[in-house]
UniProtKB/Swiss-Prot annotation:
The UvrABC repair system catalyzes the recognition and processing of DNA lesions. UvrC both incises the 5' and 3' sides of the lesion. The N-terminal half is responsible for the 3' incision and the C-terminal half is responsible for the 5' incision. This is UvrABC system protein C. Interacts with UvrB in an incision complex. The keyword rRNA-binding does not apply. It comes from Photobacterium profundum (strain SS9). InterPro entries: GIY-YIG_endonuc (IPR000305), GIY-YIG_endonuc_sf (IPR035901), GIY-YIG_UvrC_Cho (IPR047296), Hlx-hairpin-Hlx_DNA-bd_motif (IPR003583), RuvA_2-like (IPR010994), UVR_dom (IPR001943), UVR_dom_sf (IPR036876), UvrABC_protein_C (IPR050066). Residues 209-244 form the UVR domain. It is found in: Cytoplasm. Keywords: Cytoplasm, DNA damage, DNA excision, DNA repair, Excision nuclease, SOS response. Pfam families: GIY-YIG, HHH_5, UVR, UvrC_RNaseH, UvrC_RNaseH_dom. SUPFAM superfamilies: C-terminal UvrC-binding domain of UvrB, GIY-YIG endonuclease, RuvA domain 2-like. The keyword DNA repair applies.
Length: 616
């Protein structure tokens, strides 16, 4: 939080005398020195003067002006520069009165490497590796689905480079027809593999018809050469591709590369639904719920979304040549178009009121936006009802933030603690945390709980992040340990959270939970109580978050090769074994005699290796 400013009222008249008519960006601060609004202007003096008129339009603007204690101005050469600077400031300060796009995920791509035998894989983040990138896709699930389809259509390798480099025999993917096994010589010619890579590239570019035409030609050539087995392979590929074509809606303009942005607004909340269309096909879609002041205008919401969404080049986002909008951007349209064109290095068009197939796309985006918004509002009402009931049940004035802790381990191994956070909109996942617990006796849940609470609350906390309730998934013992750890920290806080233990019933069935207070008082809520449902929700979230972290830790241990624990096997011998056998799976199936055939491996060492692999 910034240093507090002088609380006397802002002298707008004196300030405006110093403001220029040039383009630029302004930052407005409140009494404690926090940036509460960032804006841009073609004419700074004209724009800033509009805030301090006698009759200010809009409830949001009036509330903003009441809180202004200071304004900083940055002059820019052009309006385009101002738009980019405004975007950077909004990302930096996350001002209260700005519309904020809550989207912190980078978009995934399908990556085709430029190796001798290229590999298909999923990619996120900056494009540092040499190769070709296809996308972006709306989420990792869409990429995995596409890669799974690609394995069936064009069986080029998807294995890690380390696996590929150490194989001497084809893997299971080859056996089931999902890979051509370029790792093993003589199974496929260089030309045939290159052809399949070319087909995959064309398919990812949306050029299905070109791929089918080439495959038909190859099938006919194979038939004429009496190579009927190869002709049948090409025929199967053609049929599979045609089945895929039938499942996709394709516009008549097969070269369409565009994003379609639908928007819906209701009860102070907005939903923006984006359809990503590449080569005339719907690549995917996604709904966004920007954080916004309750009375923000639709034009402002959409303008802020477009700016923040497409200027976020760090997310690897591609700006298509055409962006279809469900609402006009008004005065901002020209500068946004110019800015996006400058960034993309080509002409970008923002279009409203489209016709034909584009109108169908927009209607689809608008329908999806309204559907997602209706669902979100319904969920929000349910959450609000549950918070209200819990507040009444616990006799609290307000509940704005709750945190819940749980511990997960297997027989004391790889202990992981979780902390999940709920606010009045439900799970606040960006504040979820996991803690790997170390330095305790395995299985000591009390010590684990003490450690996680000390790590969570032992450092200075922002006042707004101090919870109103801390739930501990456990009984009296866990709650008592938690209180002893947290009490010294709570004494320094401006408010005192309520500590509650959630003890499961004897049968451990949902609905039979007992709530335990630090005073020793216990009580239960009816099984149909909305307050109990909220407690179960946060408890289950914490439990699942801990378990998934624990499983990830266990999986890391299991990935460690059993060979690493065999005395006398260093990196070189380990690599020789894997290369000779064609991987760990094949090595595990080998007999003692077969292992002893590996150069540098004696019979005695082969015996040790065999025993370690069979019983490890």
């Amino acid at each position: 939080m910034s240093e507090a400013l002088d609380e006397k009222s802002f002298d707008a008249k004196s300030f405006l005398k110093t403001v220029t008519h040039q383009p630029g960006v302004y930052r407005m601060y409140d009494a404690v020195g926090d940036v509460i609004y960032v804006g841009k202007a073609k004419d700074l003096k004209k724009r800033l003067s509009s805030y301090f008129r006698i009759n200010v339009a809009g409830e949001k603007t009036r509330a903003l002006v009441k809180n202004i204690c200071k304004v900083d101005v940055t002059v820019t050469h052009t309006e385009t520069e101002a738009l980019i600077l405004e975007h950077n400031y909004i990302k930096l300060y996350l001002p209260k009165y700005n519309v904020l796009l809550r989207d912190d995920k980078s978009y995934p791509y399908i990556f085709l490497s430029n190796h001798h035998h290229p590999r298909l894989s999923i990619h996120r983040g900056t494009k540092k590796r040499k190769g070709e990138y296809f996308g972006p896709y709306p989420d990792a699930g869409a990429v995995r689905e596409s890669l799974h389809l690609m394995q069936k259509l064009f069986p080029i390798r998807q294995c890690e480079d380390s696996v590929y480099a150490n194989r001497s025999r084809p893997c299971l993917m080859y056996q089931i027809g999902r890979c051509l096994a370029p790792c093993v010589k003589e199974l496929i010619t260089e030309k045939d593999y290159e052809d399949q890579v070319s087909f995959a590239r064309l398919f990812l570019q949306g050029k299905d018809r070109q791929v089918i035409a080439s495959l038909v030609e190859k099938m006919e050539q194979a038939s004429q050469s009496l190579n009927f087995e190869q002709a049948a392979t090409f025929r199967d590929q053609i049929q599979a591709l045609r089945r895929v074509q039938e499942q996709q809606f394709v516009s008549h303009d097969s070269e369409d590369d565009l994003d379609v942005i639908g928007i819906a607004h209701q009860n102070g909340m907005a939903c923006i639904h984006a359809l990503y269309i590449r080569q005339g096909k719907i690549l995917g879609s996604r709904s966004y719920f920007p954080k916004m002041p309750s009375d923000a205008e639709l034009t402002e919401v959409l303008s802020s979304f477009i700016t923040q969404f497409y200027l976020n080049q760090a997310e690897g986002r591609v700006i298509p040549s055409v962006i279809i909008l469900g609402e006009n951007l008004g005065d901002d349209a020209a500068v946004i178009t110019e800015t996006l064109s400058d960034i993309a290095g080509r002409k970008i068009e923002l279009k409203v009121n489209p016709r034909g197939n584009r109108a169908r796309y927009l209607k689809l985006a608008q329908t999806n936006a309204m559907t997602a918004l209706t669902s979100k509002l319904s969920h929000k009402m349910t959450i609000h009802e549950r918070f209200s009931e819990l507040r009444k049940a616990l006799n609290l004035e307000t509940i704005s933030r709750m945190e819940c802790f749980d511990i997960s381990h297997t027989m004391g191994e790889k202990t992981v603690a979780s902390c999940v956070v709920f606010n009045q909109e439900g799970p606040f996942k960006q504040d979820y945390r996991r803690y790997n617990i170390t330095g305790i006796t395995g299985g000591d849940d009390y010590a684990a709980m003490g450690q996680v609470l000390e790590r969570r609350y032992g450092k200075p906390m922002e006042p707004e992040k101090i919870p109103d309730i801390i739930f501990i998934d456990g009984g009296r013992g866990q709650l008592s340990r938690a209180y002893n750890v947290v009490k010294p920290f709570m004494d320094e806080w401006p408010k005192q959270p309520l500590l509650i233990g959630i003890a499961k019933g004897v049968t451990r069935k949902a609905g039979l939970e007992t709530l335990i207070f630090i005073t020793g008082e216990e009580f239960s809520l009816p099984s149909d109580s909305p307050a109990l449902h909220l407690i179960q929700h946060i408890r289950d979230e914490s439990h699942n978050h801990a378990i998934s972290g624990h499983r990830a830790q266990r999986a890391k241990v299991r990935k460690r090769s059993a060979l690493e624990d065999v005395e006398g096997i260093g990196p070189k011998r380990r690599q020789a074994l894997l290369k000779f056998m064609g991987g760990l799976h094949e090595l595990k199936r080998a007999s003692r005699e077969e292992i002893a055939k590996v150069p540098g491996i004696s019979k005695a060492l082969a015996e040790k290796i065999y025993d370690a692999l069979q019983h490890g």
